[in-house]
Amino acid sequence: MKTSILFVIFSLALVFALSPATEIEETDRACGQFWWKCGEGKPPCCANFACKIGLYLCIWSP
């Protein structure tokens, strides 16, 4: 029972975390911020962010 509840909570958190990223991706911004997709054909990450190889997401990098 506890596992099911945790799975549902984690799934909802993931949906809410990724939905703004999808929305922003469709707006053709000049650079990608946290959790934006990066790589070939995508805009580069903004300042203070780096494209994480393998995940192809912009991750904060000081």
From Swiss-Prot:
Statement: the UniProt record of this protein carries the keyword Transcription: no
Span of the signal peptide: 1-21
Q: Name one GO molecular function term.
A: sodium channel regulator activity
| Expression sites by tissue | Expressed by the venom gland.
Xref: Pfam families:
Toxin_12
Mind telling me which InterPro entries this protein's record contains?
Answer: Huwentoxin-1 (IPR011696)
Keywords, sorted A to Z: Disulfide bond, Ion channel impairing toxin, Knottin, Neurotoxin, Postsynaptic neurotoxin, Potassium channel impairing toxin, Presynaptic neurotoxin, Secreted, Signal, Toxin, Voltage-gated potassium channel impairing toxin, Voltage-gated sodium channel impairing toxin
GO-annotated cellular components: extracellular region; host cell postsynaptic membrane; host cell presynaptic membrane
* Residues making up the propeptide: 22-29
Q: Where does the record say this protein resides? A: Secreted
Q: What are the cysteine partners in each disulfide bond?
A: 31-46, 38-51, 45-58
- Does the record's keyword annotation contain Transmembrane? no
What free text does the record give on domains?
The presence of a 'disulfide through disulfide knot' structurally defines this protein as a knottin.
Q: Which family does it belong to?
A: Belongs to the neurotoxin 10 (Hwtx-1) family. 33 (Jztx-1) subfamily.
State what protein this is by name: Delta-theraphotoxin-Cg1a 3
